[in-house]
């Protein structure tokens, strides 16, 4: 076991505080509409320019191991806030730095760290309740656009794209952000259910120019196993031919004589047909086939349910207004499923999302939910250079998470004003001793830090501005750092999602309280390199 180095009490906290300051000072310059950029060296490729707090935090590793412990803990604040709310990472870092600084002073003055922590927790709980009570529900597209614009550092185009995407695919819809091949940023919306499987044979193509299959009002056969035997398929094919409608087959695979017969019939014009592989794998495939069945009002044909393919009739097949099959994906538009069945399935998937502990499973369940409930929107971010595209993509990602958070828990005045207004709720809190009261005072001072930092980054005096905001009793009165004017924050579109502000404060307080109550630090000593053996003689005799 490697030897360890240990530091105690004030010495330990001082080292940690230095690490916290180094990381927080690098992150906090990005806060607000006039926040600065941070340039990060990459071991290969061009340097990265970003205004995203968590991206800066993740890159910082300090040489001094004790200082690095402090930096790593604050990095954890930024990462946790990013995971839960997707934005507000810089605010969380600024709050953490302020609480640690004030808390360390109080501990150095001889106060009980555990009572300080209790006081901090009391204050945070009171502020969280206040934010929830004051949050205003997001109702209009304009408000969604404003949240997106603020989170993308004042880029109105990003706000507009996000509002448009959410309007088209709904709040449950999936919105993904990709890098564009061109200099323009564009929005593409896929309505209906799309999955990443294309046609099994190019001979199925009906639109040769676009190389895709387009069917209006087709029947959809949903089968769980491979189809290779033609005899099983014949009854269904004959029934579909008589109906005069096209047929789309979704199965694990279609091969051998079954595929050959379908292709020949398609080429001769006797049958409008196309076959695609079922999406997903294993149990997830079963679930996705069931989703398609519910969306189209059909049945997933499975031998587990005792249904044989030769006994299938037209009433068991799904229907849709339109199906488009390309080389690599299939889109089902306007399925004929019963609304009540689709809603029940959506509720079931939502319950699974709540229960799952795996991030991967949650992501896949959310994709399934979006395909049933709304659709999929893709924002392709363009720019003149690769560096610009990456920087813009960071901002769009932040804005996307912020808009989702706003829809979830509502909005509060931005620019750090919601936290400043929460100072009032700390006045009447009951405490058991003066140390707990000091804990509340620590939070009272710390929640002014984000507003002060936004103003400082804009080149003004934070203390003067915060004083003026607090003099005015109006809840939404604040300071527009972009223009340097005092305005009604909500009316001016300077708003934050309540969830982002809440998460930033809770995460910052949680980790900061742990740092304040730390009494010893243990790190591994670097291994000393063994001395090299002496060089042998040259062997030359004189």
From Swiss-Prot:
Pfam families reported for this sequence: Cpn60_TCP1 (PF00118)
Entry's family note: Belongs to the chaperonin (HSP60) family.
Domain of life: Bacteria
Protein name as catalogued: Chaperonin GroEL 2
Keywords: ATP-binding, Chaperone, Cytoplasm, Isomerase, Nucleotide-binding
Sample GO molecular function, one term: unfolded protein binding
PANTHER family: 60 KDA HEAT SHOCK PROTEIN, MITOCHONDRIAL
Broad class of enzyme this protein falls into: isomerase
Residues holding ATP: 30-33, 51, 87-91, 415, 496
Quaternary structure, from the entry: Forms a cylinder of 14 subunits composed of two heptameric rings stacked back-to-back. Interacts with the co-chaperonin GroES.
InterPro entries in the cross-refs: Chaperonin_Cpn60_CS, Cpn60/GroEL, Cpn60/GroEL/TCP-1, GroEL-like_apical_dom_sf, GROEL-like_equatorial_sf, TCP-1-like_intermed_sf
Gene: groEL2
Any single GO BP term: protein refolding
Compartment annotation: Cytoplasm
Biological classification of the source: Bacteria, Pseudomonadati, Pseudomonadota, Alphaproteobacteria, Hyphomicrobiales
Function as written in the Swiss-Prot or TrEMBL entry: Together with its co-chaperonin GroES, plays an essential role in assisting protein folding. The GroEL-GroES system forms a nano-cage that allows encapsulation of the non-native substrate proteins and provides a physical environment optimized to promote and accelerate protein folding.
Catalyses which reaction(s): ATP + H2O + a folded polypeptide = ADP + phosphate + an unfolded polypeptide
GO CC, one annotated term: cytoplasm
């Amino acid at each position: 076991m490697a030897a360890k180095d240990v530091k105690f009490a004030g010495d330990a906290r001082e080292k940690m505080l230095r690490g916290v300051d180094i990381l927080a000072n690098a992150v906090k310059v990005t806060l607000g509409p006039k926040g600065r950029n941070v340039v990060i060296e990459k071991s290969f490729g061009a340097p990265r320019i970003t205004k995203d707090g968590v991206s800066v935090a993740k890159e910082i590793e300090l040489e001094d191991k004790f200082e690095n412990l402090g930096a790593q803990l604050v990095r954890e604040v930024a990462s946790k806030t990013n995971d839960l709310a997707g934005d507000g990472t810089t605010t969380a870092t600024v709050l953490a730095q302020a609480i640690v600084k004030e808390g360390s002073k109080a501990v150095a003055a001889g106060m009980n760290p555990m009572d300080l922590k209790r006081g901090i927790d009391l204050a945070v709980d009171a502020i969280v309740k206040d934010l929830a009570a004051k949050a205003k529900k997001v109702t209009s597209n304009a408000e969604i656009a404003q949240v997106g614009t603020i989170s993308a550092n004042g880029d109105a185009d990003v706000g507009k794209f996000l509002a448009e995407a959410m309007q088209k695919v709904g709040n449950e819809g999936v919105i993904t952000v990709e890098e564009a091949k061109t200099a323009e940023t564009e929005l593409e919306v896929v309505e209906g259910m799309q999955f990443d499987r294309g046609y099994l044979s190019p001979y199925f193509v009906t639109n040769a120019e676009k190389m895709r299959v387009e069917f209006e009002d087709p029947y959809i056969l949903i089968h769980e196993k491979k189809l290779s035997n033609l005899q099983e398929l014949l009854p269904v094919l004959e029934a579909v031919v008589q109906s005069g409608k096209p047929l789309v087959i979704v199965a694990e695979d279609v091969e051998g004589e079954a595929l050959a017969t379908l292709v020949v019939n398609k080429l001769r014009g006797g049958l409008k047909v196309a076959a695609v592989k079922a999406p997903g794998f294993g149990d997830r495939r079963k679930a996705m086939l069931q989703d398609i069945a519910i969306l189209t009002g059909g049945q997933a044909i499975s031998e587990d349910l005792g249904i044989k393919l030769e006994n299938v009739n037209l009433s068991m097949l799904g229907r849709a207004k339109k199906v488009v099959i390309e080389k690599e994906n299939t889109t089902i538009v306007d399925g004929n499923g019963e609304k009540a069945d689709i809603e029940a399935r959506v509720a079931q998937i939502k319950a699974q999302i709540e229960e799952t502990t795996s991030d991967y499973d949650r992501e896949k369940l959310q994709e399934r939910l979006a395909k049933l409930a709304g659709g999929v929107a893709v924002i392709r971010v363009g720019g003149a250079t690769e560096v610009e595209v990456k920087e813009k993509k960071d901002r769009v990602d932040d804005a996307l998470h912020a808009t989702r958070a706003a829809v979830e828990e509502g909005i509060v005045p931005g620019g750090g004003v919601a936290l400043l207004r929460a100072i009032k709720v700390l006045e009447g809190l009951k405490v058991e001793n003066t140390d707990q009261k000091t804990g509340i005072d620590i939070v009272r001072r710390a929640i002014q830090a984000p507003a002060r930092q936004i103003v400082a980054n804009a080149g003004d005096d934070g203390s003067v501005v915060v004083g003026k905001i607090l003099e005015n009793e109006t809840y939404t009165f604040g300071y527009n750092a972009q223009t340097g004017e005092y305005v009604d924050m909500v009316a001016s579109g300077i708003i934050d999602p309540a969830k982002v502000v809440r998460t930033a404060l809770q995460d910052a307080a949680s980790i900061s309280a742990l740092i304040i109550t730390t009494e010893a630090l243990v790190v591994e000593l670097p291994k000393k390199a063994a001395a090299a053996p002496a060089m042998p003689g040259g062997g030359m005799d004189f």
